[in-house]
């Protein structure tokens, strides 16, 4: 799988050892010149649907599970590896732990949606799936970086998503 960009390093982790590794899977769902992304009312940002890979799952199983949870996706088809991103960052809940997170991005389609199975924190943050143009997602995420993303562990999320958005904009020639 291609590496989309160099590792993003959260400020303050440069000289610290990596204590844990985390793997995530994320979907690039593109239809009618728009992406299906997950919007957070609290953070006013747009991220690719997906999440953490669990022990014992392969990456495709994890992707399908995450899309069922976040989007209510009943059927995920056309899954094709797109690329990966790495981040060295602080943990979200344990902010003294330094993680190396690898996010694997896959192109896919979802045509059949049912009920979501959101986690409590996703409900609390007001997350919902929305269709949005690539340019609008980039613009809104850049605004969110300036206003909302100053917490340890969150500082690499939107830069990562913006890098991927710009890369897929080129890929789709959008």
Regions found by a protein language model. Give the residues of each.
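Short, charged/polar surface micro-motifs in flexible loops or helix N-caps
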Residues: 33-35, 43-45, 54, 86-89, ...
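Conserved Nudix-box catalytic region and its N-terminal flanking loop in Nudix hydrolases
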Residues: 30, 34-73
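Active-site-adjacent beta-strand/loop module that shapes the phosphate/pyrophosphate-binding cleft
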Residues: 88-117, 130
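Nudix hydrolase/Nudix homology domain
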Residues: 114-174
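A structural signal for short, well-ordered beta-strand segments
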Residues: 27, 81, 104-106
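Acidic, metal-coordinating catalytic segment for phosphate/diphosphate chemistry
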Residues: 1-26
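A short coil-to-beta-strand element that immediately follows conserved catalytic motifs
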Residues: 74-84
């Amino acid at each position: 799988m291609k590496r989309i960009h160099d590792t993003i390093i959260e400020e303050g982790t440069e000289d610290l050892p990596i204590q844990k590794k985390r793997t995530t899977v994320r979907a690039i769902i593109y239809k009618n010149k728009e992406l299906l992304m997950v919007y957070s009312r609290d953070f006013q940002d747009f991220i690719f649907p997906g999440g953490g890979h669990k022990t014992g799952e392969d990456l495709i199983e994890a992707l399908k599970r995450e899309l069922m949870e976040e989007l209510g996706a009943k059927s995920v088809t056309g899954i094709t590896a797109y690329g990966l991103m790495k981040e060295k960052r602080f943990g979200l809940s344990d902010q003294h732990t330094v993680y190396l997170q690898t996010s694997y991005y896959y192109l896919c389609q979802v045509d059949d949606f049912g009920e979501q199975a959101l986690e409590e924190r996703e409900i609390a943050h007001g997350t919902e799936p929305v269709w949005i143009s690539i340019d609008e997602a980039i613009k809104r995420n850049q605004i969110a970086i300036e206003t909302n993303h100053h917490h340890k562990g969150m500082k690499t999320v939107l830069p990562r998503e913006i890098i991927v958005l710009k890369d897929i904009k080129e890929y789709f020639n959008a």
